[in-house]
Amino acid sequence: MKKGIHPENYREVLFYDGSVQQGWIIRSCAATNKTMVWEDGKEYPLYPLDTSSASHPVYTGKRREANTEGRASKFNERFKGISSLTKK
C-alpha cells in the first residue's frame, strides 16, 4: 500500500442507530467528537444515525410514523394567507 495517500483519521468508527439500538463498526474518516463503549468493551468514535437499514421502512417492511412535521407543510403553514392577498 502506498504511504501518504490515506487520510490521517481513517479508523474504526461505531455507526449507531439509536431508534433500534443497533450499531456497526466500520473503518471510516467520519468526523465526530463523541465516543461510546461497544459490546466488546472497547471505546470507539461514535457516529449517530437517524435511520439505517435496520430501521428504515423500505428494508424492514414495517410502517413507521414520522414524529416531525415535514418542510413542505411548515412552509405551507407559514405562508397560507399569502395566496388570498395576491388573487384579484
UniProtKB/Swiss-Prot annotation:
Origin: domain of life: Bacteria
Keywords of this entry: Ribonucleoprotein, Ribosomal protein
One GO CC term, this protein: ribonucleoprotein complex
Cysteine disulfide partners in this protein: none
Gene Ontology molecular function: any one: structural constituent of ribosome
GO-annotated biological processes: translation
HAMAP family on file: Ribosomal_bL31_2
Self-association and partners: Part of the 50S ribosomal subunit.
Family: Belongs to the bacterial ribosomal protein bL31 family. Type B subfamily.
Protein name: Large ribosomal subunit protein bL31B
Annotated source species: Glaesserella parasuis serovar 5 (strain SH0165)
